[in-house]
Amino acid sequence: MEKFTTHTGVGVPLRRSNVDTDQIIPAVYLKRVTRTGFEDALFAAWRGNETFVLNQPAYTHGSVLVAGPDFGTGSSREHAVWALKDYGFRVVIASRFADIFRGNSGKQGLLAAQVAQDDVELIWKVLENSPGTEVTVDLAAKQVTVADIVAPFQIDDYTRWRLLEGLDDIGLTLQHADEITAFEATREPWRPLTLPAKHLPAVPITAARPVA
């Protein structure tokens, strides 16, 4: 996972509250078996409306989404984070996030920056009055800068550390690679191993239902 320190990109104002994961990416797209290529699914139900913000030329290449409160509610699906990242978003700013969405975001390298609603309102006004305005997000300083607005944001220390270090779950595990290798080299032979089956079961297996 790429380290996140600061990011500057075009801000996209999404004046909608309670945006749930099914609105972020409809369930029909979850049938895909790949982990990438979900950019076309992002906000699919809304993008058919030509007035939707992502259909406006000034915002099509945005990378900082500024949303309403309670973003990411609904069912837990990593695909919501994947769709946002595949489209090009690095940061989502909102005054409140669903806990599971916030957790999934941190694990996938998407920064969920919690900003006071009064500051979100000010940022929206700037982005709507001056489409294409860039937003700078400084994770080290926990600060968002838009034009003359400087707003602090909240993020838990553990997620902030993971993003700064660029550590997803696999990266965290690989930090202990030497310890894992040493353990495997000295583990007792009687401990169970996960190996492919090398023989048929000693007892015949009877199908629960007749096989045609």
UniProtKB/Swiss-Prot annotation:
Catalytic reactions on record: (2R,3S)-3-isopropylmalate = (2S)-2-isopropylmalate
GO molecular function: 3-isopropylmalate dehydratase activity
GO BP: L-leucine biosynthetic process
Pfam families to which the protein is assigned, alphabetical: Aconitase_C
Pathway listed: Amino-acid biosynthesis; L-leucine biosynthesis; L-leucine from 3-methyl-2-oxobutanoate: step 2/4
SUPFAM superfamilies referenced in this protein's UniProt entry, alphabetically: LeuD/IlvD-like (SSF52016)
First-level EC class: lyase
Cellular compartments per GO CC: 3-isopropylmalate dehydratase complex
UniProt keyword Disulfide bond, yes or no: no
Annotated EC: 4.2.1.33
Keywords: Amino-acid biosynthesis, Branched-chain amino acid biosynthesis, Leucine biosynthesis, Lyase
Role of this protein: Catalyzes the isomerization between 2-isopropylmalate and 3-isopropylmalate, via the formation of 2-isopropylmaleate.
Subunit structure: Heterodimer of LeuC and LeuD.
Similarity annotation: Belongs to the LeuD family. LeuD type 1 subfamily.
Protein known as: 3-isopropylmalate dehydratase small subunit
Lineage start: Bacteria, Bacillati, Actinomycetota, Actinomycetes, Micrococcales
